[in-house]
């Protein structure tokens, strides 16, 4: 039985979603017995789709916002997801988050990062993305937003 690959919470430039199976196939035998260090996390496609390690798991990325999203999913998933569910997929929400330069705490930073990455074209956090193409009877980008927010609990449990 083929296991469905888990999508990362957001797209990143150079993301490894399509390569993740190949990368994982080339891990050493019994890799789950060892510590796992991910120095360039990005969207986390490899991390989310590999067999969980029983040892230490360390993720890192030069983009602090990326780490804050995974931290929120690990430490406060219910609060994080609840706040995201209240965010409407709209250009106004995107622009408001784009203007933010200071955050109350890491959770506020994580929400900002998630909104900017999921509501922008290609996850680049620069321009709002909107598609007239329909998916599930609604615009594609709106459908993708609702779908990923529903999948966040599973992503959060992936390697906790």
Describe every region a protein language model picked out.
Residues 32-91:
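Conserved S-adenosyl-L-methionine
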Residues 2-31, 74-159:
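SAM-dependent nucleic-acid methyltransferase catalytic core
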